[in-house]
């Protein structure tokens, strides 16, 4: 029997309280209290029970490197506390137990810097140059909210880009922005988080034919980069690899929606510029974003609808992926291929509509 270690886990901090409450509710247990850890150490304390037994106390410590340690031995009911500890442990994508250490080829500093700068547009992401010599430049990417970090090293003489760290928020943001620059081999690596891709990828022409069928009349209008991303993603998706988590296989669709939506809006007199981004143009009166009246006034109803629908889908799925929070109609994990393909199919429809509306 394998003995679990509850130290230095790659738990998604934004989900810990929600997961704890849902576990206790589903078990018909009772919450005594949930709140910040007493004392100076960052974390969460969960105290709960069920009728006829002592209180269980679970302390969840937020470590300085972005990892989390669970301590369930504090309270009077250790066995009950371990139930919650095990539940939180099992929310971790098995691929996230290990550190990422992968190498991508074909990079120069002028191609890496824009990706770092675009990643830093996320409110919780910062990057800095850590070291530089004649052979290597090293950058550190840090999440100020989640405390995880990623080390990105450019080996100048070989053109190799090395990515090292935990596959948490910094990894997701950086590789999302990097995706448009990657060839099929590189995209496969970052999507399935393995140095040597284990998916038997589908041939590009097969994936391209599939994409032509999906896009129909919109296919000839696809931007070169958009077609590259979607075909590369389909090479992996259509191989149906057996993975513990499929959320990153939605990268190509989200990148494409972002690019096509920016292009469409710019053509309609709504350029999307940083730092404001898309937010300048949309209101959110309920669960969906809609174009503000002053920008919608000159557009046809079908244009307003698809632009609003596209941004709502992009914002919801991207926010969940980057910030790892619980969002309506989205979750951190896409646990099966059917769910992934459902989201991808919806994305393809949005991309098609953006081109033909």
UniProtKB/Swiss-Prot annotation:
> Would I find Magnesium among this entry's keywords?
no
Record's domain comment? Composed of 3 domains, the NTD (N-terminal domain, residues 1-90), NRD (N-repeated domain, residues 91-197) and DBD (Dmd-binding domain, residues 198-357). The DBD is responsible for dimerization, growth inhibition upon overexpression and recognition of T4 antitoxin Dmd (via residues 327-357) and antitoxin RnlB and subcellular location.
What's the Enzyme Commission number for this chain? 3.1.-.-
Q: Which InterPro entries match?
A: RnlA/LsoA-toxin_DBD, RnlA_toxin_N, RnlA_toxin_NRD
Q: What is this protein called?
A: mRNA endoribonuclease toxin LS
Among the entry's GO cellular component annotations, what is one?
A: cytoplasm
Q: What induces it?
A: Repressed by IscR. rnlA-rnlB forms an operon, the downstream rnlB also has its own promoter.
Q: What does this protein do?
A: Toxic component of a type II toxin-antitoxin (TA) system. A stable (half-life 27.6 minutes) endoribonuclease that in the absence of cognate antitoxin RnlB causes generalized RNA degradation. Degrades late enterobacteria phage T4 mRNAs, protecting the host against T4 reproduction. Activity is inhibited by cognate antitoxin RnlB and by enterobacteria phage T4 protein Dmd. Targets cyaA mRNA.
GO-annotated molecular function? protein homodimerization activity; RNA endonuclease activity
Key words, A-Z: Antiviral defense, Cytoplasm, Endonuclease, Hydrolase, Nuclease, Toxin-antitoxin system
Q: What class of enzyme is it?
A: hydrolase
Which species expresses this protein natively? Escherichia coli (strain K12)
Has the keyword Hydrolase been applied to this entry?
yes
